[in-house]
From Swiss-Prot:
GO terms of biological process kind: amino acid biosynthetic process; aromatic amino acid family biosynthetic process; chorismate biosynthetic process
Cofactor entry: FMNH2
Protein function: This reaction introduces a second double bond into the aromatic ring system.
Pathway participation: Metabolic intermediate biosynthesis; chorismate biosynthesis; chorismate from D-erythrose 4-phosphate and phosphoenolpyruvate: step 7/7
Species annotation: Ruthia magnifica subsp. Calyptogena magnifica
Superkingdom to which the source organism belongs: Bacteria
Protein name: Chorismate synthase
Length: 365
């Protein structure tokens, strides 16, 4: 299996399966002398880990990350950083009934066709369990970007099923299990999820992610446009079916006079572009939104086939999230951080001595 690495100068490689012994992460390209301990990475892992509320999977993983290499005396050395997270709460017996069957909406059929062999326990490599290591690796990028460039990456749940956040307060995001910025919607979300869980069904969600205090100049103008690499990273997250940058699909109904962002010496007057112009960061906030599909693992029956092509009815057992979007915020933050970090390293390597005479325009007024 290829395709387990992302990035060019700042790269992360992950390994491990849902019910394997552990998850492994390899980070290459982190500059030296960055103060780094496990505590710097654990906070986001704790936000993502399962079993923290009745609205998520009841699999109980501590998700404790350990740094195996790449640091000395609490600082990065500039060499490869290796990370490990042990899996401790596997219940593989829950998946014995799908060993020779295909769950609709999952990667069972495609993995079987591509490799001729698959780890059916919890979805194996295709499980979102893999994203725990992305969050750990992304924590390194987040710390470097914040410490060296002042870039801060934050996300929140803007919609769960039919329920949209209408008010916004960053303080509320980490004050409820949904990462919802609207305190007035929390009770509604709880009631909706309680009813959904009892029905045995699932639902999708929308997550918004921003990167503040961005420098100008990150990204390449053609195939490695900043927004293209952001979309690549976001679409690599399990269950993500759509990505928007800035105005996104709203641009379809906007007139050009509305969509273009006026520029003054005092700042951009709007940010419909989402912080990227011509594939290169403008210095405005990066604005990203992702859509996540409903979980396919349901206790409600559905038609499928077995490995012999015989028709069957599938009912999925195990512990699953009725809405994967609830735990997706730290994952999306990590992928945005990893992408921006890679472009920071690339810009530093190629353009560190460039000095434009044009004044730097502040972000939106």
């Amino acid at each position: 299996m290829s395709g387990n690495t992302i990035g060019k100068l700042f790269t992360i490689t992950t390994a491990g399966e849902s019910h394997g012994e552990a998850l492994i992460g390899i980070v290459d390209g982190c500059p030296p002398r960055l103060a780094l301990t496990e505590a710097d990475l654990q906070g986001d892992l704790d936000l993502r880990k399962p079993g923290t509320s009745c609205h998520t999977s009841q699999r109980h993983e501590e998700d404790l990350v350990k740094i195996l290499s790449g640091t000395f005396e609490g600082k990065t050395t500039g060499t490869t950083i290796a990370l490990i997270i042990q899996n401790t709460d596997q219940r593989s017996k829950d998946y014995g009934n799908i060993k020779d069957t295909f769950r609709p909406g999952h990667a069972d059929y495609t993995y079987d066709q591509k490799y001729g062999f698959r780890d059916y326990r919890g979805g194996g490599r295709s499980s979102a369990r893999e994203t725990a290591m992305r969050v750990a690796c992304g924590g390194i990028a987040k710390k470097y970007l914040k410490q060296v460039y002042g870039i801060e990456i934050k996300g929140y749940l803007s919609q769960l099923g039919p329920i949209k956040a209408e008010n916004f307060d960053w303080f509320e995001v980490h004050n409820n299990p949904f990462f919802c910025p609207d305190a007035s919607k929390v009770r509604t979300l709880e009631e909706y999820m309680d009813a959904l869980r009892k029905s045995g069904d699932s639902v999708g969600a929308r997550i918004n992610i921003t990167a503040n205090n961005m420098p100008v100049g990150l990204g390449e103008p053609i195939f490695d446009r900043l927004e293209a690499d952001i979309a690549h990273g976001m679409m690599s997250i399990n269950a993500v079916k759509g990505v928007e940058i800035g105005a996104g699909f709203k641009a379809i109904t906007q007139k050009g006079t509305e969509h273009r962002d006026a520029i003054t010496l005092s700042g951009f007057k709007s940010n419909h572009a989402g912080g990227v112009l011509g594939g290169i960061s403008s210095g405005q906030d990066i604005l990203v939104s992702i859509a996540l599909k409903p979980t396919s693992s349901l206790r409600l029956p559905i038609e499928s086939i077995d490995k012999n092509g015989e028709p069957i009815e599938v009912v999925t057992k195990g512990r699953h999230d009725p809405c994967v979007g609830i735990r997706a915020t730290p994952i999306a933050e990590a992928m945005l951080a990893i992408t921006i970090m890679d472009h920071v390293m690339r810009h530093r390597a190629q353009n560190s001595n460039v000095a434009s005479i044009t004044p730097i325009i502040p972000a939106s007024i």
